[in-house]
Every structure is written in structure tokens, then in C-alpha cells.
Amino acid sequence: MSSSSQASSRRQWCYLCDLPKMPWAMIWDFSEAVCRGCVNYEGADRIELLIDTARQLKRTHVMQDGRSPGPQPGGKHGPAGKEGPMEAGRPPSERYERGRGEYVSARLPNGLPRLEDGGPPEVSRQSPTARRTLVGAVPPNLMAQGLVGAPHGLLTAMPLNPRAGSAALTIPAPMLNEISKRQALSMGLSVGVPSFMAPEFEKEFKEKQRNAEALAELSESVRNRADDWAGRPKPMRDALHTLSGCTPFNVRFKKDHGLVGRVFAFDAKLMVEFELKIFIEYPCGSGNVFPSILALVKHMFHDSQKDTGKVINSGYKYVEYEKRHGTGDWRLLSELLSDAVRAFKEMPAPDALPQPYLDASCSMLPTALCHIGRPTQPRVRRRKASPDPDGAERMSSEELRQHWPLSAYPGIPGHMPATSLASAGQAPEGHGSDPSPITALMSVADNVGTASSKDGPGSSGHSANAGRQNSTSPSPGGGQRRLASRNGEPSAGSSTGGPATVTDQSAVMGGEGSAGGGGAPLCCTICQERLEDTHFVQCPSVAGHKFCFPCTRDFIRRQGPGSEVYCPSGEKCPLVGSNVPWAFMQGEISTILAGDVKVKKERDP
């Protein structure tokens, strides 16, 4: 067996993009094998949705007229005279002529029809000449709209000499529909429901499409919230902060108390005037997001099978909210969100505000599914070695905590006890808590001119910005850390550790350098020893809390095994936008205690 055929035999097909990939480029953490390119492009949180949609499409699109018989015994074709009868016996849609030296791939992935080829398989997949002018036989209008690119694995081989008269392979219509829908879905485009989809899947398809649009709207809202809210009028900003401080809280259908959802986010949308926007998950823990009360009520009417044809103008009178969990105090949502409150003309009544409650059985909020890690424009960051004392004092720690709204940091708060959220006066941590302290730290560095390290060509692999595109030496597993952040890994204090957790600790090791040009050297808060500017432990809440590794190790050992380890300063520093103190993850603790990290300290001038 030749080396090229051995290489091709090791390749595996990505379930989404239908391209052959080497084993190291595949990820096996999902229900189907997918390549890293698809995961990075779509986001780990959307991969299962796309896999499920593709699986349903394959199940319903039988494509009987598009299937061709398998390879015949004696795989190698003889001369042109011998393959004539074989070509004549094929359906017209599967006949084709080959130009000299041109081949079509004989292997089609994921159950798509296989078209036989006279050329050796290893040549068709490996030879550069096999990829010389490849044109997909798809309608021009789909190509122009960008719905269908070159269909993966179904490219039509065109001869180099256009005068040779070779005809392009014609792709059957059902197969083309399959390609079009799959490509559009994998690109995140909105496509109509295929007319040939089975009725039992049509409703589910529409619901998933609606939910994907709602999640995209939620993601956009959460991503731009810090900047958008800062520019809004103070009454509007105060109302949004007040309402966000009450989330999450349960709501139910007035006509059927068994239909329960939860409100988890608020925002303002500009119509003729600014109006309150509300995001609801229904049912609780399902991940189904509704961006308006009207859409929620219509769905609840359908589920309850009561007055399904009723015309609904405003849904607030059909929804009740729970003021305090477990007390049975349910009130109409219109009492909390009156017309004046929704128009930001009045503040919500203090006695009507609900207390946040997070059900331990469904602790992940839909904000964990948002693509928070995709900035609109890459930032050019330069690293400076010395801190700016003025910049560090520009905003107090309390101002830093209040600078971001409660919902600025989506994550999974499952590590927190439910009683801490149900207690009075406790701000909810749901989507206010961060997946890990380092993510909050990176957000602080990105949005506020406080002390922050600047990446450069010589930055260490343990930099706080490890894994960013402009870092030339990312930490090992940096991609896993990004995927874990998207997928909502348990945050600080969780007993579950893993590769992403260890990588997060590597980022914590990086710490935040500084943003100033010259000033006092970096010193450990405990021992006052001078710190190397990129290797120390940084508290994500208080910029002035910086610790060397020996002091951090001593502090962790003093806490004893199994206990929560908070800021080495001895204070329980809360995450920005929340009253919940951050704590080290178990993987971070293990990394710090694994051994001394010896770094070369800068010499005093």
C-alpha cells in the first residue's frame, strides 16, 4: 500500500463539513466526530444542535433516486471499451465522461450517494492534479446567495482543456437539496422548512430555528450590554440594573400553573421609543429562549391547549411571577412590569421586586450558550512591563464591580448552593457570575484602563491573554479553554476540574501585568517581594491584589483539603457585577501546588 493510500485511510470524515480530516484534527467529545474547524467556527455550544439537525435531515431525506449501486467486484476499470457497458447501465443522471487525468472522489461521506470512478482512490484524494479545476454543479442562484459553496465531497471534475467536450457530473435534485440545507444550516443561515420534510419533524425544525434566532439575539444583547447600557439615560440604566438584580425568577402561565419558566435577562430595545426587552427560558432548564412575553404566551397557550385560536395583544396579563420562592406568593407580571416601567418612565415598585431563585436541578442559564468570546473587532495590544499607579487607582474596586451589569458574564453557577441565592438581599449570580476568575479578569483588562498585561511577540505562553489570536505562543490546550468557556464549564470553586481548568490556571499564572509606562514595581500583596511582570496570581476582583506563587501555595495549604479557597488576601472578593465571592477551581489549586514555578525576576535598576 502506498504512503498516499495509507494517509487517506487514516483520514476520517467530519460529520458537519464532510471533509476528510486527520485524526489529530478531529474532536470526539460530541455525539458525532467533528473537526476542530467546525467547532471553532460554530462554537462548541451549537455543535450538538447542528449535529442533531443534520441527523434529522439525513433521516428524512431518503434520496432514493439519488443513490447509486456500490462498487462492483473488481474495482479497477479496464480500457474504455470495457467500461462502456458499465456506463450504459447507469441512470442518465449518473453518467459522466472523464477528461484525461481528471478524477472524481469515489468516496462520499455520511450516507450520501456514492458515485463510481474509474481512477485509483488514492490518486483521486491525494494527487494535486485531481484538484485542478473543480466546479460544483449547483444552481447559480444558490451560489450567488452564498447558500451553497462548493459541495464538500461532491465537486464536479472539469477537464483542463475546455475543448475536450467532457460533460460535468450532474448532481440529482434530492442530493442537491440535502447539500443546500446542510451547508446553510452549518453556516448558521436561516433556511425555510423543506417541503419534503416529514410532518413530525417540521414542528421541531421550526422550533429549533426559532430558538437559534432567539439565542443569537440574546448573544448580541449580552455581548454589547456593557457599552450599550453605559450610554443610556440614568433612569433607564437604573431600571435595567434593578431588574437584572432580581434575575433569575420563576414565571408561570395563569391558566395552567404547571407551565413554568424563568426570566433570566433584561435589556432595552429601540422601537419608536426605548422599550423593555425581556428574555425568558421555558420550560426551566430546557434552553429554549423566548425574547418577548408575547412569544412565550403564544407557546404556553399551545402547550395548554386552551384557547389556541385566541388573539393575544399583550401577554403580561396571562403570566404570573413568583415574588419569593416557596412562599406561594404569585403575582401578575403586569404589576411588576407596568406600561410605565416597560417604557422606562417609572422605576419598578420596590415592594413588587422578586427575589432571585436558581433551581439547583437546572442551574445552567441560557446565557451560557451565548458567543461572548467573539469580539467584533480585534484589538491590537502592546505589552508594557511597568504598572501605572494612577491608572490602578482610577476606579475603586467597588466601582469596578458595579461598572458591568449583572448579566455581563454568562456561566454555570452550579457550584454555588441554592440557599445563597434564595436569601434576601443576595444578588443573583446566575448570569452575573463568570465561568472562571480569569475570564472576569480578562474582561476587566479589555474594558477598563486598569492594570493589564499587554501581549507581544515575546509574551509567555502563560500570559493572561493566552489563547487569543494575537498571541504568538499560546498555552497548551488554549483552544480547549476557549471551548470550555463557551460551553459553560463550572466556574471557580467547582469541584470538577479538567484540562480547561488547568489551562485557566495557566492564564491566572499569567496575571495582569500593567498598563502604565513607569512607576512602582509589581510587588506581592503579602510578602512585598518584587514580582515578575507576567508570572503571578491576580485577583479578578481587586486590581491591587497580586500574589507570588510561594505565598499563594502557603495560603492554600493553610485552608486545609476540601475547603473553598478564596482570595489569598484573606478577603472574600466578589466577582464584578455580583456579590458572590470568587474561589479557586480544584484544577487551579492542583496546578499551583504541583511544584515551584521558578521564574527569573527582573533585576532592580
Curated annotation (Swiss-Prot):
Record GO terms (molecular function): transcription corepressor activity
Cellular component aspect of the GO annotation: nucleus
UniProt cross-references to InterPro entries, sorted A to Z: I2BP1/2_C3HC4-RING_sf, Interferon_reg_fac2-bd1_2_Znf
Any Pfam family the entry gives: IRF-2BP1_2_M
Stretches that traverse the bilayer: none
Subcellular location: Nucleus
GO biological process, one term: regulation of transcription by RNA polymerase II
Bias type Polar residues, positions: 460-475, 492-506
Any coiled-coil regions, as ranges: 200-229
Biased amino acid composition, Basic and acidic residues: 92-101, 385-402
Region feature Disordered, mapped onto this chain: 61-130, 373-517
Main location: nucleus
Segments of this protein annotated with the region Cys-rich: 524-571
Keywords assigned: Coiled coil, Nucleus, Repressor, Transcription, Transcription regulation
Job description of the protein: Acts as a transcriptional repressor.
Family affiliation: Belongs to the IRF2BP family.
PANTHER family in the record: INTERFERON REGULATORY FACTOR 2-BINDING PROTEIN 1 (PTHR10816:SF17), MYELIN TRANSCRIPTION FACTOR 1-RELATED (PTHR10816)
Name this polypeptide is given: Interferon regulatory factor 2-binding protein 1
Underlying gene: irf2bp1
